[in-house]
Amino acid sequence: MKMLDLYGYTSIAQSFDKICISIASPESIRAMSYGEIKDISTTNYRTFKVEKGGLFCPKIFGPVNDDECLCGKYRKKRYRGVVCEKCGVEVTSSKVRRERMGHIELVSPVAHVWFLKSLPSRIGALLDMPLKLIENILYSGDFVVIDPIATPLSKGEVISESAYNQAKDNYGEDSFLALTGAEAIRELLVRLDLHAINANLRVELESTTSEMKRKKIVKRLRIVENFINSGNKPEWMILTVIPILPPDLRPLVSLENGRPAVSDLNHHYRTIINRNNRLGKLLKLNPPAIMIRNEKRMLQEAVDALFDSTRRSYVSNKAGSVGYKKSLSDMLKGKQGRFRQNLLGKRVDYSGRSVIVVGPNLKLHQCGLPKKMALELFKPFICSKLKMYGIVPTVKLANKMIQNEKPEVWDILDEVIHEHPILLNRAPTLHRLGIQAFDPVLIEGKAIQLHPLVCSAFNADFDGDQMAVHIPLSLEAQLEARILMMSTNNILSPSNGKPIIVPSKDIVLGIYYLTLQDQVQSEDEILFFGDFSHVEYALHNKDVHLCSQIKYRMTYCNYDTSDGKPSYYSKIIETTPGRLILWQIFPQHKNLTFDLINQVLTVKEITSIVDLVYRSCGQSETVEFSDKLMSLGFKYASQSGISFGCKDMIIPDTKTMHVDNASEKIKEFAVQYQDGLITRSERYNKVIDEWSKCTDLIAKDMMKAISVYDVESKLNSIYMMAHSGARGSASQMKQLAGMRGLMAKPSGEIIETPIISNFREGLNVFEYFNSTHGARKGLADTALKTANSGYLTRRLVDVAQDCIVVEYDCKTHNGFAIRSVVEGGTVVETLDNIILGRVAAVDVYNPITEELLVKAGELIDEAKVEKIKIAGLDAVKVRSPLTCEAKKGICALCYGRDLAIGDVVSIGEAVGVIAAQSVGEPGTQLTMRTFHVGGTAMRGVETSNLIALLDAKVKLVNSNIVEDKHGNKIVMSRSCEVVLLDSVGNEKMRHNVPYGARLYVDDGQLVKITEKIAEWDPYTMPIITEKTGIIKYMDLIDGVSINEVLDESTGISNRVVVDWKLHLQGANLRPRLVLIDDNDNIITLSNGLEANYFIPIGAVLNVQDGQKVHAGDVITRIPRDSIKTRDITGGLPRVIELFEARRPKEHAIVSDIDGYVEFGKDYYRSKRRIFIKPVSDTLSPVEYLVPKGKHTIVNEGDFVHKGDLLMDGDPDPHDILRVLGVEALANYMISEIQQVYRLQGVRIDNKHIEIILRQMLQKVEIFEPGDTMYLVGENIDMEEVIKTNDNMVKMGKSPAKYAPILQGITRASLDTNSFVSAASFQETTKVLTEAAFSGKEDSLYGLKENVIVGRLIPAGTGFLMNKIKKLSLLNKEDYSMYYNNEYQDSALLQNDNNAFNQELHKDTGNIVDY
């Protein structure tokens, strides 16, 4: 252990391997106690000494002052261990007052409020009595029959006091035993035979049929089994002894004015002691029963208040009310509780904070530290140096010297901070880049200087932000800070692997200006240069300008030569002096050619250049390059003199024309609406669309006008800022010089009158009011959503914190097939982007040449992605954290590349926390960003057609087509897809075409780019006839199932189907349209069913009774709701909903099997029955109930596949998991979550979401227990079930069958194996109650548990230390060799050193195995 102490291991935190929790028995409480307390006195009011025998008694709890007894007879260390014969106090350190406990012997037992009131009540469950009855026994004086002896009463029957007296009179005093209060409950609990109850419940469970009863029995059975297995006795839930906390944990402090400030706990203890003593005295006097009962009830209430005051029934003691006293539970719960305030977050010594200012002349690894701060922070270091050099003899003088700021002090400070990294942190620390290490540079002034490039990582700006400084003290801490946390080592973002140290704002503007090129009038103006020094000379003499067009002889290098030596050749290129200046700072590498920067560079290009430099030249080159890029950018941004005035906002001349055109169209819509051709919501949607189009057109024209190059004034300044990506965006420019456009109401609806003015013209009063209306919502949202997002991050971290990389390869061959992501026909995420940095699960071949591209188990890096791209593959099977088979964590290969480094993740990396931060961090940013567009409605025009984006061949899937009377092809299938194939036959795009769309192409037809393939009405859902015939109304009765709805503004009436169930005569109606032929016979459709069209509530009928219709005609239409704007405020709740795995409010029904749709003849409680008839006759049909008024998206006779939706709405993720399995669930969740983030332009790697999903899928539900002890419907940890099943198979018994279940992140965090982690998360009292009666053990696997008990976390450097610690506990002499670096890298990280692993997996006694 000596060696371990060197490595920062404290003996107390290391001296145990697990933590167990159980209910304290009266004996164990007495054993822990140092004496009983009977007196309530605290301190003497005159001498302020603590009273003997009181709540602070020194005889029981230990001396108040170090090594000094109360009376003062013994003082000095030499008397340690002596007990003073005068005052009875043991002479020892006063620290024992923090650990010695006392106790109170209760005269009458009381119930422990946690086991009584925490739902489900454990006492109630064991006794099988409702909580109300138990409360009546405890508080209201009801009696319970313990033993009926010779009376007809039954055991456990609760009788009132009057009934008790009556029974005594009837049957005699001793003919039965009935008690009241806690004694009665205790007596019942003592008499319980848990094993018998267990056996009976299992028998009962076999025979019961009711689901409710089953659940109740299972709950009770679990509690009984937990009691049996944990060794707790039920009667311990009733207290006969109460422990008293050590006095220094409930101190008595005197304030300045001499009044004492007392901890609330002391108040509770005084009440209990007073009531207990009073009850003791009363019992000796033999008073009336009512007095005793009252006194006992008061004692019970006092103890309840001590343990948990919030659970008490009367109001004066609710938290927050005057006179509320904090109970023990309150000290653990919530943000201010022990767990979150003191154990998970601690205040740190050697720290300071100050305002930050920009330090443009710093290097990337430096930060400016004010001298004053440095002097204070490094004071102890300076003191020791001053003493060491003999400048001062004592520390006291050294302090004085530092105070007077003598010159020697500054010299020593310089020496001390040399190469001593410091940590800078900016709150809120949303991801790991919120704390980074820098080398301090001493500066004058009082503000910390920060390097401009790290601002985006900290999310810092210089408008008054503050940052905190921390000093790593120990050598190991300095080492970790320098190697892992230095700002130069954090160039890539851990969430998406793109550089985060990228220029922004002014720097981008400077570089953009540097790479601009003037347009020349004639070829004669272009000058030739052969050397860069000539260019500089010409610039100096003002012969050329930075942006002038010149010709230059550029020397190129050819690296691919036969002899391996690079060869050089020259080439004349057209460029500008500015670009040549930029070229001078580039590092030399074959991937970095001049063509990269021989163009105008905007933010996007600059980012990709930094990325390329990192991938090609490595880290140190990138850091130098970034620093040079920054200084260039700043220099030329200031030289350019870019500024803008009002005239720079050019309003396009076409604006009035576009606005007039839109107004005309809107008048047309109004006329159509008044003529009854379109409904109100259709008109609204069309108006919104028209104005959106108009705004976009004006914006386009404005961008055209503003981006025109003018010889005199060169480029427009505003355009340069927006185009370069330095500041502002197209949408902000649109509002400045175009037209503000549509605004949203706080409810999210769009106001249909747009703001036609822009900010340059100024808004009129009406427009101004409209815009404040939406903008105010943005501000309110921000405030509310920040809290929501922070809470989401907290839950994510909690659920993922114990996911650590534990081994290199778990040897699995499972994985997911990954395809590119297509939304609305466009590829939003290409395949190469998604598979980069993943590991192939199977060998990947080129389909044409059959060349092996990637071996199974190999990392797919940039080079391999390029090969896959060339091969034209549309799917690749890769390994995923979801399919990883590692125990207690995941393996490096299933995770793939560590995005922050660009190589396979190292063992011990805390990937769970990184995933949680990556998903949570943008949430906070996005919510703060809602109002940046000023509340203008950001809504794309609804897609209503499908256009070919490339020349391709059309393939139609599931297309059931009819021709209407105009010869148009109408799609009748619900699952029609148009697939576009390239010349080789590879699928390039796949689109869903909705039911009722018009198709303009045939199967196998070749289409040209921009050709229209199909179009449809996005605002209504039609119902279309398949055959020609005559319409007949069935069950469509005026006033019952249809109403003429008169539109007041138009005077035209529509026939709308209403809820017929609300009408008396409507009970058995099934409103539908029937198609008949001329002989009144119902027409049969192609699938052999009759032509019945069932009409949902809210549909508008387009046909009259008896009207003749043609195939392909629309007979009814269902209007869709007007679309609300979607921003992350819609998005964040969506992300939360998905991660919490909540069932959507009106979720779509998913088909469980393949089969044909059949509509039931009757209704079930106003729900419509749908049957899916399976293809094979051996299976029975599955029935579904669709709520009334919901539109089913299938017709009678349609064939549906397993997993297809039967009605509108979002599917329930639980259904997807149950029907289609884990891979389909993962695809659904990832695409839904990514969609929300993509809307905001945030990139998150899929693997982060997969890790969170892995944590949500840890539990399984047992549906056949086999020979195991599990119960049907029980949720158990998957690893545990697999282990149990393995044992069962070995013993030749039948294993349990189970299905995976999806838990929300909150549920999953609370159900974790570690009760310490769960208790510190939420519902602390409930978690601890549950853990205590189950006798749970916490093996301290996760990060949180280890932080709480004060150990190194088992991740990163701590992961290695844990392995070494295990070996050292085995007392092996040779474990020191594991400190050898090369050995450590190869053996520990690759996990291939058999000897090492065998050593660990031997029988290690009480050692936890990782």
From Swiss-Prot:
EC number(s) stated in the UniProt entry for this protein: 2.7.7.6
For this protein, the record's InterPro entries field holds: DNA-dir_RpoC_beta_prime (IPR045867), DNA-dir_RpoC_beta_prime_bact (IPR012754), RNA_pol_asu (IPR000722), RNA_pol_N (IPR006592), RNA_pol_Rpb1_1 (IPR007080), RNA_pol_Rpb1_3 (IPR007066), RNA_pol_Rpb1_3_sf (IPR042102), RNA_pol_Rpb1_4 (IPR007083)
Query: Catalysed reaction(s)?
Result: RNA(n) + a ribonucleoside 5'-triphosphate = RNA(n+1) + diphosphate
Q: Which controlled-vocabulary keywords does the entry list?
A: DNA-directed RNA polymerase, Magnesium, Metal-binding, Nucleotidyltransferase, Transcription, Transferase, Zinc
Per its UniProt entry, which superkingdom is the organism in?
Bacteria
A molecular function GO annotation: DNA-directed RNA polymerase activity
Which cofactors does this gene product need? Answer: Mg(2+); Zn(2+)
Q: Which residues are recorded as binding Zn(2+) 1?
A: C69, C71, C84, C87
Database matches in SMART domains: RPOLA_N
The EC category is transferase
GO biological process annotations for this chain's record? DNA-templated transcription
GO cellular component assignments: DNA-directed RNA polymerase complex
Chain residues that bind Zn(2+) 2? C810, C884, C891, C894
Residues annotated as binding Mg(2+) are D461, D463, D465
Q: One short Pfam family name for this protein?
A: RNA_pol_Rpb1_4
UniProt remark on cofactor binding: Binds 1 Mg(2+) ion per subunit.
How this chain assembles, per its entry, is: The RNAP catalytic core consists of 2 alpha, 1 beta, 1 beta' and 1 omega subunit. When a sigma factor is associated with the core the holoenzyme is formed, which can initiate transcription.
> Which HAMAP family does this entry report, sorted A to Z?
RNApol_bact_RpoC (MF_01322)
Q: Which family does it belong to?
A: Belongs to the RNA polymerase beta' chain family.
NCBIfam families xrefs: rpoC_TIGR (TIGR02386)
Question: What is this protein's function?
Answer: DNA-dependent RNA polymerase catalyzes the transcription of DNA into RNA using the four ribonucleoside triphosphates as substrates.
What name does this protein carry?
DNA-directed RNA polymerase subunit beta'
Q: Which organism is it from?
A: Ehrlichia chaffeensis (strain ATCC CRL-10679 / Arkansas)
Taxonomic path: Bacteria, Pseudomonadati, Pseudomonadota, Alphaproteobacteria, Rickettsiales
